[in-house]
């Protein structure tokens, strides 16, 4: 369709009237923020027609969105008021127009004469003026998720095109209502009802909660709808990009896709308040996407997506019905599971004003959310506690694609097609035409368990309202609420905890497999389903049982026992239901569904769209949106079983008692088997199957289609046809049912093995017993392997089939405690031998769920959850048929529960090696602990490749920062800057200086503020690294902090870390870009041995002071505790004694100062000369270190191996009676071994052997560092070193390195003799071990093999 939008602007005042030109013009920006500066420009028409004609405003000058298509009809269908001022009820637009409330939160109507006198209103988005010219281009970028639109920020003071996000709440959407103008579709009547919707009655959350767009359903009373009104044209269902130029137009699809309900139905929709409803408060905005999208996008308009928050109470305005309560056109035939095709005349519309239960969540137009974990996807995909998917335009969503035609709906597991004639459903695509529907409008069969009418407490009203004396709940209109968890779907679907299921075609499923036809109402003992076209209650009368009934005017839930049919349909003796013209179900507990689909009477529920829900706690939503406290059935023919079985659409019936007959005449026998439709496996016990191949376990599991997070329950099933069985078995896609107790015959004539075998679609036969075959390679639990919170037992035997051909035995699958269900996204822990999970085991977080990434993405944080490590979309089909072989393979996998996790977590080499290789090229030493080290290079490359122009933070935002500074509110200053600093915007130098000097180095700030300030500085350093011209600290400030009064500042260590970070980042930046300009670096300015040797001496002095101020601890204790205490310092400072606090602080300072010295060695491009100079300065300080433990700390923390070699060499040279002229080499080390004595002080009272032990230890340090110097080319300049390492140039042979085995043996023996002479025999074992280690190090350094080169003594 080549629809276009004609937008004309009003360049005059509001008083100007008359016909305006129809040529398209863009909205222009208001050039002044002062009120009344320029006349206000408003949208007159948004017309989707192709005819060129004069566009006239209504008499009040309101903006019109014309959705009409015929040229002869000049009356627009809907009016969207974009102005700020309401209009009085007396000044409504002509009767041919439908009014929508204005986007502001003010009154709906206001006198027309007042509008011209008010100041011009401007558009504001995100508190910034918006240029509507560019809003269209920016809206589809999707780079930033819009949050919401604030009530008080609809009109801007000044234009700004850069911001496309919405902040604040979406309360204006609450007031946006669509009145069903019945007469607008009729040529004989022009009457319409005014629908005032006061704003004060609708409290909205501030985080972008979308109040449902609701439409008053006023069915036609005179003549049937014309073809244009009966079905939505395809072009009306897709929102063109141009329609998104204003926020109100994004709802255009929903506004157009509302055909009127059948005629001859009374419209009693006025003044029916909707109870408050829970909505997740996830502040994620969602940008609009095309309607055919089945999976949630990253961004959708104002709808929470990935992370469901705690439910928020919301009240809805009166006289409002859901946009999707009217999905069926006059030609749509409601389809019930009983094969009943009810004509629209016999279908009572119960759509209007269905008050959802306190736990029901209604989203505008197409969003249905449950009280626990509902997630709405942009394409109308509703995700509920289990896994709900709602398509916006009464479009059922299938596993992969949904297709809606004007006439009817066809749902299949993989594709749903709606045609005008009827609803067709198939195992993969079953088409059911109106003629093929077997059920007549007059009769509803009821099972034996659901007695026709209970004598006590039954009230039958002409409207079919029944009440029971016990547990009766009456909802205002057609809402059936259960005492536990009732959920209302946008198409008037009520779902109760007792497993209420509503299918759009009027399908009702009962706990014992009750089915409701459009003409009649069947209610089961535990589950009731209500459809909008054929609500469970028939007009003739509904009987309610006296026990545990839930009564709604249009819907009756009889949890107790009774199901009353409209025309007194007889019940079968055992819960058997026979559909007309079809094969009766097997005796016992079999139920025959219309299209060959027979749900079991025991615990099965069949939804009309191929959606079957189990009883107990299942909830089925029409159009694939199921909600329930425990069981959730997904759309597209995905059945869910709360108890033991599931019936899939497409005619695959499971039998609870004895046999299940599938549509193809294939009987299925299962005690607890579950047949999924279209190859969607489902678990018998408590599994839940989602439409896109996503199966959810029962209990409280939640399946989210398309990456929506899961359930509070315990079982989580990921997409890709991965079912989880909570009880004993699961059916994999392909339509192969599993058999629980006997043989199960799949519709294709495939029979799985008896016992407990499960047949997977790809001719995969799982072994008998309790084996479970996962579809798509996802782990399936069988044999009661998964325990649902509803006390589903776990069987000790069974196998788990993991995606990567990993079968795991379910014998030790952990039980799921009932407490786990308390978490909205409780995860099933399938690790072997793990005890029952508790609420603490489950992360109580609303994490976004990516089903494509893992079977349960919430499990990713749980190391024992094995399902989270595998990509479902990349797992091949499992073809193992031998159960014993599979069990054998499962044992080693279970023995090593972390193996799967390790395999899943192997990083890609290219991604993680880049920073490491970068560091290796230049330093080959541990980098500074930069919080963003691995992202430094990608960010730099991205900025360079895009050529982004850096700009300072805008002046208006800086005013907010300066205000906090003036008010002495440092936390606000830091938080504002944290938000305002971005890759494109950098803070001014004076602001950074204020953060460093006035906040980080403040003596009065709390630890939290100091940490926030440090994180801000790290973010600025990451995005905009400082250089020699922009650095905001100098050596004078550093000296003050390290020496004078600054030693008592609480932010002293954080400041030192920031200083070292700036030195390191700037040094590496220059090495990457301008290697020949190291003299321009900050490090060269302050740490050059040639330019600033006194600064280097200061660093050495601070280093020795920090080392000697440490607590006197034994060497072994010091080496063991120092790293750990350093890590724990920040979290345990307030608990640790003061000495430990100082000790930890000193250790951190030592590491930072050592890093500064390692940089000082490199900055002058002459590492050998610089190391010699620094070693000379350091020698005197080292001799003054009193304790060995302190000297050990001094040498072990030294990062530069070249510097350590030089310092040790100077110490040994001064300790030798006869200094050697040998250069630093292996021969020099051998010389030191027998000619040096210890110059270092040792104040301990222990024996003299520790002095020699320290000398040997220093020789080991010397040998080790010397190897690093040779192999890493540390004597070469850092600029040349990169090429030497890349080319793998071997180090040049050094004079004095050509020692032999004989030389080593001789010198070691001479040293032993020397020790024996001084210390006496026997030598201390510790000293003997160190001498032997030194010998081995010498052999290794000289690349000698003592076995091949025997010594002279031998």
Curated annotation (Swiss-Prot):
UniProt subcellular location: Nucleus, PML body
Region of interest: NSE5-like domain: 953-1288
Gene of this entry: Simc1
Protein name (database record): SUMO-interacting motif-containing protein 1
Biased composition (Polar residues): 445-455, 788-825, 1111-1130
Location of the motif SUMO interaction motif 1 (SIM): 45-49
Keyword rRNA-binding: no
Region of interest (Interaction with SLF2), residue spans: 864-1354
Superkingdom to which the source organism belongs: Eukaryota
Motif SUMO interaction motif 2 (SIM) per record, residues: 64-68
Region (Disordered): 1-34, 432-471, 530-770, 783-870, 1111-1142
Biased composition (Basic residues): 22-31
Organism the protein comes from: Mus musculus (Mouse)
Keywords assigned by UniProt, alphabetized: Nucleus, Protease inhibitor
Start-end of Low complexity biased regions: 432-444, 732-752, 852-867
Tissue expression: Skeletal muscle.
An annotated GO cellular component: PML body
Keyword Thylakoid included in the entry's annotation: no
